[in-house]
Amino acid sequence: LPISCIMKIQLLIISLLLAASSLYARSLDKVFQLLPQPQSVEVFPGKGIMHTDLKFVSTAPGTPVPILGALTDVLPRAGRGGKGLYLQLSGQNVPDSPEGYVLVVNDKGVIVTARTEAGLFYGCQTLEQLLEDSRDFGREIPQMKITDYPAIAYRAVHLDTKHHLDRMEYYYRMVDRLARYKVNAVIWELEDKLRFTRRPEIGAPNAISKQEMQALCRYAKERNVEISPLVQGLGHAGFILKHHWELRENPASDWEFCPSDPRTYEVQFDLYLDALEAMPYGKYLHVGGDEITAIGIDDRCKATGKTAFELQMIWLKKVCRFAVEHGRIPIFWDDMPLKYAGIWELVLSDKSEEEVAKVWDTSKLDEAIGLFPKECVYMRWKYEDAATSAHRRLLKWYHDKGLKVMGATAASAGDSPFMPRRNTRSEYVKGFSQLVADNQLEGILATAWDDGSPHLETVWRGFIAQGEFGWNPSARDIGAFKQVHAQREYGFLPEDNRMDFLDELEKAVFFFDGALVTSGHRNPAWGTSDFTLIGLPDKANPGAWSELYEDKIARAKIEADRYEKIAEGIRKAKAEALRNRYTLQVYEQTNNLQNYPVRLILALNDYDTA
């Protein structure tokens, strides 16, 4: 018999066996932890498979083999005896989502069925995790049926390369890691890190060439990851306006373009064209447009007779038209219209519904609705709790006006040196993802602002949280997510508690922030203010320094003990990890760096009291 007939017979047998056992469904052994959590897992009695049992990959006619993981890619594509991995495209008895799939495990093998190659890819990624757990913990994968699909169609993370670039190899590995956790998009804030060919003066010396970026985007596309550019415009334009003084709104500031100078658009459109050519497979062009501080103040703008807000929205219409004409959907940060309307601070607040109801007023937005391009996606960014009353009201306003909205949470908000805090901000990722799913918004983006220069490895738990909660926002709480993250990333079982050190490290870095100052803020990210450093001991007046800084010394002693606890936790984690030791090494050096103020304070105390 030809292979296609054999496969059909095998699929029929497996399906009948599965149906016969469906009356006896049970729960999945806790040693198998899938991330993201599938929508439905049914487990049945009977013999399953071990990670070594699969002997080949077979496809139905017209079904491609997607990019496979390490444990399945080694399997031959020719049918042979034994248990196989069977792949088939079908529109029957599968989820409606193009990324959905059904995965069946039986003693005959594994079947993955999906509508599209993307669904097959994700089904095989889920199988890869099952095989890993079978290998790592010596357990048989039980007979089961997984029916799975995403709650949110567009699940993106943000790359902010304003301040530094990693090696290209790192970005390839990043794509693999994102795909593993079913993140399907990247919005890349390029700044000057693309080698612009139309405006070569803009690119930094270490910028990525368009050809290098095209190759990376092609690699990502094969793994169902779509990369789109973010090219800042109107504001945040220092990387451009340091070269083009003639386009500044304020000659003393490189922050904003003049939106009334036609040459502004000549430069911006050239940069857009280069970015679109470098990233040819994305659907979006993010045009920035946030945090404008002063437009409408020079003679070119005054001559138009337009207000600052009107000038901003005229700019937005022009850049949106460009995006649409070039086959992209424009995205725009939405803070400036909210500031114009006087509701920005309210949207950021956590005021109760009763408090919000008394002051909520969108009349200025209502009057200006004709200025809002309908083709634009308004990126509603809120980096902490997104479920507040004012925020929900704003989302309803967008919906009522027929405007498209995408959510933006933060895996790194840019305000923390060393690393993001609060469980790598995963609770905020979860909360906004749930809101996006409930309101059927255009998608969700986990931003990763680099202002505080955290090592990107310290942001990854937040990225993986976006994979988890963008796919299935409600299945797990944060504690359960952290345990599954530890297993998937490092091979630690939940009862090992091997990542507890990370909770302690997040606490420790708070002391670093203010350890050496008595007033003000010296946080190396945004928010720096005038500050006063602690003084030095006076050898002519021993003990006075220690008395003055008694509280800091007491806290430093606590943090010294915490440092040792963290160091021991990392040492054990490195010894027992099955993978990703590099991330643990980054945490180790982060711990050493954040401990510097502790050691300095204790050394000064020793000197003062010697």
For each feature predicted by the language model, list its residue ranges.
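Extracytoplasmic/secreted envelope proteins and their assembly/folding machinery
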Residues: 65-68, 117, 121-124, 128, ...
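Short, Φ-rich (hydrophobic/aromatic) sequence segments
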Residues: 38, 67-74, 124-131, 170-177, ...
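Bacterial N-terminal signal peptides
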Residues: 12-20
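Positively charged n-region of N-terminal signal peptides that target proteins for export
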Residues: 1-12
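Substrate-binding cleft of carbohydrate-active enzyme catalytic domains
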Residues: 151-336, 342-354, 377-379
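Substrate-binding groove of N-acetylhexosamine-processing glycoside hydrolases
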Residues: 28, 34-37, 41-44, 59, ...
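Contiguous, structured surface segment used for ligand recognition
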Residues: 26-154, 247
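N-terminal small/glycine-rich loop or linker at the start of catalytic domains
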Residues: 143-162, 406-415
